[in-house]
UniProtKB/Swiss-Prot annotation:
Keyword Ribosomal protein applies: yes
One annotated Gene Ontology cellular component of this protein: mitochondrial ribosome
Gene this protein is translated from: Mrpl28
Family: Belongs to the bacterial ribosomal protein bL28 family.
UniProt main location, coarse: mitochondrion
Pfam family, one: Ribosomal_L28
Taxonomic source organism: Mus musculus (Mouse)
Subcellular location: Mitochondrion
InterPro entries associated with the record: Ribosomal_bL28, Ribosomal_bL28/bL31-like_sf, Ribosomal_bL28_sf
Transit pept. (range): 1-55
Protein name per UniProt: Large ribosomal subunit protein bL28m
Length: 257
């Protein structure tokens, strides 16, 4: 007899179908249920299931085994480009006959000032060389944030930036360069392919806890009393009836002469 009624790996999905979780927006639930594999950073995948052994010419099965990577809380406040801490062992004194000791491989971090066109603001961010290379490949900081999916960004700070950018694009905020409308229009036109509805942009990058709190606050708003709703409907019906009736014109006695 199994220990649990449902397998452990299904608990998270079952939780999303019950209670307040089930009332979250459908697009946000889809983003939680999508399990995408992040782009390999610390190893090179084979890209195939079989390879030819150069020694004997036989076809052998190969398997991609990802290296376990630890992402500390500091990585959520910067843009590490998918890099993290790798825990492992090394030989003492580089001698294979000596005992193994623990070792932590850390990414090389830099502090850089990055400018966002959409937000018109500079951010002092902790980055890696890979992040700077990815920004160059994307042709700009804003393009890097908007194009990179959540699993590759791997940063709460990055997802918060993406939500802010998407909201400004969706609202066509006039506070961006108010003294230069032409520049503002050029920026919005440059990133028009990333525009999504504002109702969806508000939920981008939220954690499940933040989304539940947002949903709870939306549901706690004072509802409109039913009697007010019925009174408005009654008034509207009476107005429609009055407008639909034909106008009756009474003739005066002097009009017959």
């Amino acid at each position: 007899m199994p220990l649990h009624r449902y397998p452990v790996h299904l608990w998270q999905k079952l939780r999303l179908r019950q209670g307040i979780c089930a009332r979250l927006p459908a697009h946000f639930l889809r983003s939680l249920e999508e399990e995408r594999t992040p782009t390999p950073v610390h190893y090179k995948p084979h890209g195939t299931k079989f390879k030819i052994n150069p020694k004997n010419g036989q076809r052998e099965r190969v398997e991609d085994v990802p290296i376990p990577v630890h992402y500390p809380p500091e990585s959520q406040q910067g843009l590490w480009g998918g890099e993290g801490l790798i825990l492992g062992y090394r030989y003492a004194n580089n001698d294979k006959l000596s005992k193994r000791v623990k070792k932590v491989w850390k990414p090389q971090l830099f502090t850089r000032e990055l400018y966002s066109e959409i937000l018109d603001k500079k951010f002092t961010v902790t980055v890696t060389m890979r992040t700077l290379d990815l920004i160059d490949e994307a042709y700009g900081f804003d393009f890097y944030i908007l194009k990179t999916p959540k699993e590759d960004l791997g940063s709460k700070f990055g997802m918060d930036l993406k939500r802010g950018m998407l909201l400004r694009l969706a609202r066509q905020d006039p506070h961006l360069h108010p003294e230069n409308p032409e520049r503002r229009a050029a920026i919005y036109d440059k990133y028009r392919s990333f525009v999504i509805p504002e109702a969806e942009a508000e939920w981008v990058g939220l954690t499940l806890e933040e989304a539940l709190e947002k949903q709870r606050l939306l549901e706690e708003k004072d509802p409109v009393p039913l009697f007010k709703v019925y009174v408005e409907e009654l008034v509207q019906r009476l107005q429609e009836q009055v407008l639909s009736r034909p106008a009756v014109v009474q003739k005066r006695a002097g009009d017959h002469a």
